[in-house]
């Protein structure tokens, strides 16, 4: 059992084989003798161990024997067993038990396993020719050969062999050492083997011949391809022989597969002009490819491999080929377009296999087309062009020569440019005409001209200035000079003596590629400007802005794109500003774009190249952005929607304020623009001084230099009495709650001003009284009464509180404000402030009514008018309310005018009566002196003095009011007080009588008395002043 494994020793296997062969006859005889006796024995009395032992020996012999002698002995045993089993089945059919059946099955299984094992061993041994299989590239040949034939053809046909092939035939063992029975068996093979062997051999020869034929066809095909692509004569056979001699063993293996090798990225052929395109947008067609690739040169062919199956369509990208007329143009296209984004697809280019190039391209770039067009008319014979005009077509025309010599000189230096006609019918007619003229002579040309004088196709024979005639004349001359119809000389020459130079067309201008001038023209658009986006980047930005939503991821992706292209920050800012200026954009997109601006500004301080440019460029555009947002905010019809939009914009302002991106005044300005409080157009008109930008030159005025003129007032040496924000010392002394005695005594002792007094320090009494008389307190009360009557009842208490607070604030303001300005504008300011407050209150009422009306419209409580939008209907309602308010205002003014007239009339009557009844000063003194009893004088005083004393009290109160409002004349206030004290006998009663005189007025209202009673310290001050 030593030779079961392939790695076993060869000597042991040979010994066992020889012993098996010599003892085979005895073993067979023993099997013949013992077989029937054993089988006839009953199963109960049959000894089991010898049977098992004999069976094992038999199986061992069968497994070890692999010679053909065993194949002859095996059919004998099978026949004997078959006959024996038949006899047994016929005689003792019923005596078979389950164990016997199992043993028979085991025997059959073991025999089958032994046969499989023999085949396995025969596969590793070359002695058995029936099992040899050979492999040839391109097909399988089952050649059953003898050993000597396989040895002869071992190197020619591929045959797999194990690593122990060298040890298969050891030197000490030859074919003679084998047993004679084995040799006899080999000679007794059937004659069919020879026929099969001859048939296999012929197939192999035929296969070899077929391979040679394929190789020859392949070489011929490569030669024809190279000749067509380069317009060259066929290559010599030496090149093909040299190729066939290189690496014969490798060529034998791969020659059949070479034609099917992929060539999309093959750079082995240096003459190919075909480019492979591996990633094309499915929406791109051949015309687009021509426009994209045609910028680099004329194209020979363009092809897109359109998808045919569902699998190819699922890839969502196409591939194709673009062939140029010239290798240099193809190299430039590969260099400039590889990796470029075209219609959002990255171009992946490579070299493809060479294709036949046609004589005429399918696409000619416009820059090259211009050079192949005929020149403009010049007026010279044969449309000759001056050299300067030929180099620069835009050069101005030279003036016509004055004499013949100048004309001849210009003509001799001019160049006649020959251009091949592009119309194929005309070109064929010219060639046919030249053919007959060369054959028949000039008489044929004259006859044709006479016959076809009215035929437009033969116009080239008569019009000498046309490009067709120039080509006809040159082609005829070239053929007569011996040039070939397909090859001609391209040097400049003179056709006529002292005539112009003729410049023939190039042989094939499309094979030479584009000139350097044309290349520069084609690449004018190619280099991208620094700080500008490319076309595909601009398209991507616009696509991002169109699809932007207020989602975190979308805004983050857009912000990353902006920062990655920060070198083009200005263009990106302009694009975003433009997108925010469209009113029809939905509100969520507007909010998303504003959030994008906020994100970019927040990240403008990040460590990214050129990111800080966004802060600079957005600063110049934010005013426009928020003006457009204000326009959008005004067009929103729904109240809740507009408030939501406003809230989102205001959150951006709060975030920017926290980030400190821009100064706070600038953010307040932007907020006012958004709310509509400031208009950009008005600001631009008022702004005369340009903005101070980084890098702008600073003007000559620096800190420390004297300024000549500020606000139009020249600065003198005189000190400024009043500065905004600086409290005046004289005002600081007079505070609420401080007794006036101590303060005024201190004022007398202290010097008031250390400099020369101004004209405002001393005020004439007459001017002060005149100013006091101009404003009447009763008129102010009337205005307040009328405004309060017209206000809504729901807001009466609020308006009263507002007026009280305003009155107290106005008093405090008068105490601390500038006396110089307030004395001049006191009366006007009081009326204006009260009127403005009235107007504001009325406008608030109108806006409340309008908002209520708008809510009712939106909720459906009020019907919508056909043909009007919500906004138009609301505006119409607002105009109605304003019109009503104007009408009421006019009625009030009329009533006021009537009341003013009545007041003036009543005052004039009272003054006349007073003048009549008031006695002179002397008469009063006489009465006081001559009165015997105080009771009479007192009674007379009580009867006669009410009107003058009430008038005096009114005037004194007006003067006190003026003095309290203007504290600039503190020196005069005690003087006035003392004078008034002299006029009135009892100073303590004057305020009480003035209060009675106020109560006697018919227009006194309870509201005003309430407001007067709420400031008791003021009346206290007045009483103390009167005491002084």
Swiss-Prot record:
Residues where Phosphothreonine is found: 718, 930
GO biological process: RNA processing
GO cellular component terms given for this protein: nucleus
SURP motif repeat ranges, renumbered to this chain: 429-472
Locations listed in the record: Nucleus
Residues recorded as bearing N-acetylalanine in the entry: 2
Glycyl lysine isopeptide (Lys-Gly) (interchain with G-Cter in SUMO2) crosslink site(s): 80, 145, 168, 208, 747-748, 759, 821, 828, 831
Family according to the record: Belongs to the splicing factor SR family.
Protein name: U2 snRNP-associated SURP motif-containing protein
Organism: Pongo abelii
Gene designation: U2SURP
């Amino acid at each position: 059992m030593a030779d079961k494994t392939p790695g076993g020793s060869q000597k042991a296997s040979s010994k066992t084989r020889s012993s098996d062969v010599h003892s085979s006859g005895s073993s067979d005889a023993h099997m013949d003798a013992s077989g029937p006796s054993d089988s006839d024995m009953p199963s109960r009395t049959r000894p089991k161990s010898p049977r098992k032992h004999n069976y094992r020996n038999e199986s061992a012999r069968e497994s070890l024997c692999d010679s053909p002698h065993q194949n002859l002995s095996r059919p004998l045993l099978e026949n004997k067993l078959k006959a024996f089993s038949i006899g047994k089945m016929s005689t003792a059919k019923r005596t078979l038990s389950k164990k016997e059946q199992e043993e028979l099955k085991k025997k059959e299984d073991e025999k089958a396993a032994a046969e499989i094992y023999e085949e396995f061993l025969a596969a590793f041994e070359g002695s058995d020719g029936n099992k040899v299989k050979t492999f040839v590239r391109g097909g399988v040949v089952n050649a059953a050969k003898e050993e000597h034939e396989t040895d002869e053809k071992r190197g020619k046909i591929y045959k797999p062999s194990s690593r122990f092939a060298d040890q298969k035939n050891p030197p000490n063992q030859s074919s003679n050492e084998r047993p004679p029975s084995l040799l006899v068996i080999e000679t007794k093979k059937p004659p069919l083997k020879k026929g099969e062997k001859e048939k296999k051999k012929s197939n192999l020869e035929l296969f070899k011949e077929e391979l040679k034929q394929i190789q020859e066809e392949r070489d011929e095909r490569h030669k024809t391809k190279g000749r067509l692509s380069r317009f060259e004569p066929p290559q010599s056979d030496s090149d093909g022989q040299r190729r066939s001699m290189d690496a014969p063993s490798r060529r034998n293996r791969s020659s059949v597969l070479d034609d099917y090798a992929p060539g999309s990225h093959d750079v082995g052929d240096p003459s190919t002009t075909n480019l492979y395109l591996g990633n094309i947008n499915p929406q791109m067609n051949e015309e687009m490819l021509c426009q994209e690739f045609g910028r680099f040169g004329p194209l020979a062919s363009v092809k897109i491999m359109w998808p045919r199956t569902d699998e190819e369509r699922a890839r969502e990208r196409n591939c194709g080929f673009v062939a140029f007329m010239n290798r240099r143009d193809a190299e430039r296209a590969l260099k400039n377009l590889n990796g470029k984004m075209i219609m959002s697809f990255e171009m992946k280019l490579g070299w493809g296999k060479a294709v036949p190039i046609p004589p005429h391209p399918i696409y000619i770039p416009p820059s090259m087309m211009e050079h192949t067009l005929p020149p403009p008319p010049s007026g010279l014979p044969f449309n000759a062009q001056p050299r300067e005009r030929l180099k620069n077509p835009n050069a101005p025309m030279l003036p016509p020569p004055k004499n013949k010599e100048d004309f001849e000189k210009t003509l001799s230096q001019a160049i006649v440019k020959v251009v091949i006609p592009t119309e194929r019918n005309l070109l064929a007619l010219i060639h046919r005409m030249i053919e007959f003229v060369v054959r028949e002579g000039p008489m044929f040309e004259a006859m044709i001209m006479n016959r076809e004088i009215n035929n437009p196709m033969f116009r080239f024979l008569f019009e000498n200035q046309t490009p067709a005639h120039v080509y006809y004349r040159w082609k005829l001359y070239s053929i007569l000079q011996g040039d070939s119809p397909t090859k001609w000389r391209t040097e400049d020459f003179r056709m006529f003596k002292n005539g112009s130079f003729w410049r023939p067309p190039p042989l094939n201008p499309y094979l030479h590629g584009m000139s350097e001038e044309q290349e520069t023209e084609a690449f004018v658009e190619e280099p991208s400007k620094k700080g500008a986006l490319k076309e595909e980047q601009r398209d991507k930005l616009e696509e991002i802005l169109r699809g932007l939503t207020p989602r975190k991821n979308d805004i983050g992706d857009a912000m990353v794109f902006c920062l990655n292209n920060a070198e083009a920050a200005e263009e990106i800012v302009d694009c975003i500003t433009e997108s925010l200026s469209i009113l029809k954009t939905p509100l969520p997109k507007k909010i998303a774009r504003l959030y994008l601006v906020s994100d970019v500004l927040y990240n403008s301080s990040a460590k990214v190249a050129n990111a800080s440019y966004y802060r600079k460029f957005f600063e110049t555009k934010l005013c426009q952005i928020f003006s457009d947002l204000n326009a959008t905010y005004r067009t929103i019809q729904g109240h809740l929607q507009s408030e939501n939009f406003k809230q989102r914009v205001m959150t951006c302002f709060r975030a920017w304020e926290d980030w400190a991106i821009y100064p706070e005044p600038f953010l307040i300005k932007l907020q006012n623009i958004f709310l509509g409080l400031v208009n950009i157009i008005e600001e631009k008109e008022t702004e005369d001084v340009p903005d101070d930008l980084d890098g702008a030159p600073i003007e000559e005025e620096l800190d420390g230099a004297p300024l000549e003129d500020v606000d139009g007032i020249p600065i003198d040496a005189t000190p400024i009495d009043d500065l905004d924000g600086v409290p005046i010392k004289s005002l600081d002394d007079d505070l609420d709650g401080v007794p006036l005695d101590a303060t005024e005594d201190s004022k007398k002792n202290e010097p008031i001003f250390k400099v020369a007094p101004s004209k405002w320090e001393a005020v004439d009494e007459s001017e002060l009284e005149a100013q006091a008389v101009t404003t009447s307190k009763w008129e102010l009360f009337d205005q307040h009464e009328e405004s309060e009557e017209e206000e809504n009842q729901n807001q009466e208490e609020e308006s009263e509180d507002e007026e009280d607070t305003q009155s107290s604030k106005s008093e405090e303001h008068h105490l601390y404000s500038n006396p110089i300005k307030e004395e001049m504008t006191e009366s006007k300011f009081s009326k204006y402030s009260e009127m403005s407050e009235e107007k504001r209150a009325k406008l608030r009422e109108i806006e409340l009514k309008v908002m209520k009306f708008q809510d009712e419209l939106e909720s459906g409580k009020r019907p919508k008018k056909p043909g009007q939008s919500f906004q138009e209907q609301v505006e119409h309602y607002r105009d109605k309310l304003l019109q009503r308010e104007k009408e009421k205002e006019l009625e009030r003014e009329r009533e006021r005018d009537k009341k003013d007239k009545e007041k003036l009339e009543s005052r004039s009557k009272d003054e006349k009566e007073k003048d009549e009844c008031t006695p002179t000063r002397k008469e009063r003194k006489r009465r006081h002196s001559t009165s015997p009893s105080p009771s009479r004088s007192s009674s007379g005083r009580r009867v006669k003095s009410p009107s003058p004393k009430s008038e005096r009290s009114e005037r004194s109160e007006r003067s006190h009011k003026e003095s309290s409002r203007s504290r600039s004349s503190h020196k005069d206030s005690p003087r006035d007080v003392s004078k008034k004290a002299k006029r009135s006998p009892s100073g303590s009663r004057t305020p009480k009588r003035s209060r009675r005189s106020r109560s006697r007025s018919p227009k006194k209202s309870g509201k005003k008395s309430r407001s007067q009673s709420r400031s008791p310290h003021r009346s206290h001050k007045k009483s103390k002043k009167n005491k002084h």
